[in-house]
């Protein structure tokens, strides 16, 4: 099994329009149940929601406040899951209530451990 990072990106305009507290609460409950089902299956390793605002630090030490992707989109959180391959990880992401309810999109990235990084560097050196 490999580790995969789910970068959860929210459409901030949709969140602003979600004034129905009952619908919001239902979405949160569905998300928590989804995470629990993954954890019970041994597939969910870690995850956290993120604040909308943050700081971007560059080499020249210029610090900017954000969100940084787009004015309409922000990174809402992340999850680390286990899957056999990228296809299976993407299939798991499709089951996320935030995706099904068209609140979020999930970017799925394999997490390359240091072993894989060292192997890749050795290949480049050849």
Where are these predicted regions, by residue range?
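Conserved, structured core segments of small domains
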Residues: 1-126
């Amino acid at each position: 099994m490999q580790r995969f990072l789910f970068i959860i990106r929210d459409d901030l305009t949709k969140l602003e329009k979600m004034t129905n507290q009952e619908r919001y609460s239902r979405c949160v409950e569905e998300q928590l149940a989804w995470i629990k089902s993954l954890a019970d299956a041994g597939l969910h390793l870690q995850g956290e929601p993120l604040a909308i605002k943050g700081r971007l630090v560059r080499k020249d030490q210029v610090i900017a406040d954000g969100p940084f992707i787009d004015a309409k989109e922000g990174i809402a959180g992340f999850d680390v899951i286990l899957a056999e391959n990228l296809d299976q990880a993407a299939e798991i992401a499709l089951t996320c209530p935030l995706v099904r309810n068209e609140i979020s999109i999930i970017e799925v990235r394999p997490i390359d451990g240091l072993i894989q990084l060292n192997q890749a560097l050795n290949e480049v050196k050849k």
